[in-house]
């Protein structure tokens, strides 16, 4: 009876002692971590507007995730294989959930969001925001500039920064320990497919994250305490802030839920393809595998500097790190600021932009990773062939990406900012051009951003600068009339918001996204072959440390600095800054889209172009380089084949004896 109960209990635990069960749990962890990461990137614009901070600070917040990751990556990669890897991954998922909760906390600690406007906050009629002659200017941002320093909410973005650091700390063990766990206990021929499934999970997470971000961006940030009918802004307005905090609460819950299964997995698994006896005892092959794994783990603590020297002297490994740093600099810059670029370039809201990104870009990425893994498994592609496959696929996608330079739109036509009051475009913003003969008598503020669109198709920075004298309606339906600067036949009225860019610009957005579909598919198709070059160019005992060192270099040389320097460069293309209560600049309201486009498309293209130089040298080195991964793979396959032959011989002997009896 006791043995029976023990066997049932053992079976209950042993259901987790399978590599495929671990793969399922790890895929869920990949989904949850990529979900929260994508949601964070999608909400950066909303966070920028909520706290009134420049893009360079937003870049610091984004890079803080990598700072947290950097704090533990070498420690985890070095000691991770000695410790209980599944439990460490589970703890990491729970810590990520804690970080997401901390990010959402400022919403509950600070007051309501107050967007920049010259319109009255109530329905009471007021002439203070109209064009009125012989009036002293009463639209100063505040009487006491020290209010900005005194206000607690002006530094609330630090909570987001710290929360993102904690999220980065939690994410640290998932990839290096998860990949090394699979590499240790999966068949070598199945490893590319399993990694392809993980990469697919990393595209499902962003898909869910972008859909969640799209939904939250359409909800006003203070939905629980503000009557949205009184708002004078819409989701397409650059002052609009969506309910960014809701999604982080969802991400916190998902990350904590995905942590539970990892606490039930054993420290080691039977090597895939090696069978256990029915009573749960290990066969000789499995004992040998476990003994070898233990020896490798003891060795990694003794020979840390030996392994570091070996990795540093591995030319393909070092060149691969250089390629990854350049490619990730380009990728992080492109992906982090893509919502901002599409909003400014094509005049779309954040909700529309992130929805289109999820709809057009992520399915081909998911498909590409899956097909790439299947190709590697089906045709048993060698490392040398994988290197060539990855190189030529990346090069073809790189050349295709240059078509994006054609899919461009002009700046929003804003009088005194991008065009003259007669509608003639000019390149540079000069402050005294904000005023014209039609509004100099109005004594308007030249700093406030509360744009209106005139019947003449030209936008103005405020109703006062448009020379408007009265209004009808309330909220977003407000219409301004008798606007002296609007010279259209028979009418001189304006409505709230910037003017639309027109159908031609919308068509170019569709073409841009179609190019992105093919580009994402081709690039992701090269992902698995490229990653297998990294895994197979290092010895098995160096694998965990090698993967961790690779991730460390990417984070310190790309993940942390890239969004910071790119954000600072984007700030230099700003045409008009928002104004805080103290009169200091807040978030940027409008960019010079031509300069922004050259920066957004040009810098990543230059970085990616440079990455093909070390990639070419890798192709040259593969001709003579002896890949440890291929040697170990062939040995494992040979051993498994011999084991299968012996099992077949034993089976035949038993059958013959049964026949004789």
Curated annotation (Swiss-Prot):
Membrane topology qualifier: Multi-pass membrane protein
Protein name from the UniProt record: Solute carrier organic anion transporter family member 1A4
Annotated source species: Rattus norvegicus (Rat)
GO cellular component, one term: basolateral plasma membrane
One GO term of the biological process aspect: bile acid and bile salt transport
Tissue: Highly expressed in brain, liver, and kidney but not expressed in heart, spleen, lung, skeletal muscle, and testis.
Entry note about domains: A conserved histidine residue in the third TMD (His-107) may play an essential role in the pH sensitivity of SLCO1A4/OATP1A4-mediated substrate transport.
Keywords, alphabetical: Cell membrane, Disulfide bond, Glycoprotein, Ion transport, Membrane, Phosphoprotein, Transmembrane, Transmembrane helix, Transport
Glycosylation sites recorded in the entry for this protein: 123, 134, 443, 482, 491
Subcellular location: Cell membrane
Catalytic activities: estrone 3-sulfate(out) = estrone 3-sulfate(in); taurocholate(out) = taurocholate(in); prostaglandin E2(out) = prostaglandin E2(in); L-thyroxine(out) = L-thyroxine(in)
Residue numbers bearing the Phosphoserine modification: 633-634
Role description: Mediates the Na(+)-independent transport of organic anions such as taurocholate, cholate, 17-beta-glucuronosyl estradiol, prostaglandin E2, estrone 3-sulfate, L-thyroxine (T4), the cardiac glycosides ouabain and digoxin and thyroid hormones. May play an especially important role in the brain accumulation and toxicity of digoxin and in the hepatobiliary and renal excretion of cardiac glycosides. Shows a pH-sensitive substrate specificity which may be ascribed to the protonation state of the binding site and leads to a stimulation of substrate transport in an acidic microenvironment.
All copies of domain Kazal-like, residue ranges: 432-487
Gene Ontology molecular function, alphabetical: bile acid transmembrane transporter activity; organic anion transmembrane transporter activity; sodium-independent organic anion transmembrane transporter activity; transmembrane transporter activity
Lineage: superkingdom: Eukaryota
TM region(s), chain numbering: 21-40, 60-80, 87-111, 155-183, 203-223, 242-266, 311-332, 353-376, 381-404, 513-535, 545-570, 605-622
Sequence ranges on the Cytoplasmic membrane side: 1-20, 81-86, 184-202, 267-310, 377-380, 536-544, 623-661
Phylogenetic lineage: Eukaryota, Metazoa, Chordata, Craniata, Vertebrata
